[in-house]
Regions:
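Membrane-interface segments of envelope glycosyltransferases acting on lipid-linked substrates or membrane lipids
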Residues: 1-222
Length: 222
């Protein structure tokens, strides 16, 4: 019913705009409709400018710790439990810190997990900031654990600031942004063990990871 309803309304549209190659293919395959692909706008100069603003944030001041960041709404879609389970495995093997920034109904669930697992010294949960970029700029790795997305702008913003990205291979967006793993690492949705392995291997593969970061940055066309 939904498919027929969509087709009915689509025929009255002069032009249909989508924001990812995946959706362009879906419209072609499901509805036999040609669409126009226009990526979400990305103001690189503003991101870079804001990232350089002074930030007094001692949590990320330890130069010996691997610094990981996640910026996302606190909802089931963003699957923070996978992130926390993966991080719990890392703490036992590596000196690291995790900053989780966002807002939403699952905030207490996230904080309770951290308390129960005694991870308070390693994880900081803060509300979304007007300027998230100077926090992001202090991190080594950006992690996305979503169950599904559209085209997550936050991955593009992390690429602008030359951060290594580890993302769930969720529908849709991460695989397209990371070029099937050429510009970052992908793991299956919910696979916290593989996520932890990829984070642990980060320092061992620095040369390869820096190459991926530079490839991503040099191919940003938005």
């Amino acid at each position: 019913i939904k498919k027929n309803l969509f087709k009915f309304f689509f025929k009255y549209a002069h032009k249909i705009i989508v924001n990812s190659s995946h959706f362009k293919k879906e419209f072609q395959n499901v509805f036999n409709i040609n669409t126009v692909l226009i990526y979400n706008p990305l103001d690189k100069s503003q991101i870079l400018k804001k990232s350089k603003k002074f930030l007094n944030f001692k949590f990320f001041d330890d130069s010996k710790s691997l610094k990981i960041i996640n910026i996302a709404r606190f909802t089931n879609q963003k699957d923070h439990i996978t992130l926390l389970k993966g991080f719990e495995l890392i703490v036992k093997k590596k000196k690291c810190k995790l900053l989780i920034m966002g807002y939403g109904k699952n905030k207490e669930i996230i904080k309770n997990f951290i308390r129960q697992k005694k991870l308070n010294n390693y994880i900081n949960v803060i509300d979304f900031q007007d300027n998230p970029y100077n926090y992001l700029n202090k991190a080594d790795i950006f992690v996305l654990t979503s169950k599904f997305e559209g085209l997550p702008n936050v991955l593009l913003e992390a690429q602008v600031l030359k951060k290594f990205i580890i993302s769930s291979d969720c529908p849709t967006g991460p695989k397209e942004i990371l070029k099937n793993g050429k510009y970052g690492d992908l793991f299956n949705v919910g696979d916290y063990k593989n996520l932890s392995k990829k984070i642990i291997r980060y320092n061992k593969n620095l040369k390869v990871n820096r190459s991926k970061i530079n490839l991503a940055y040099n191919n940003l066309k938005r």
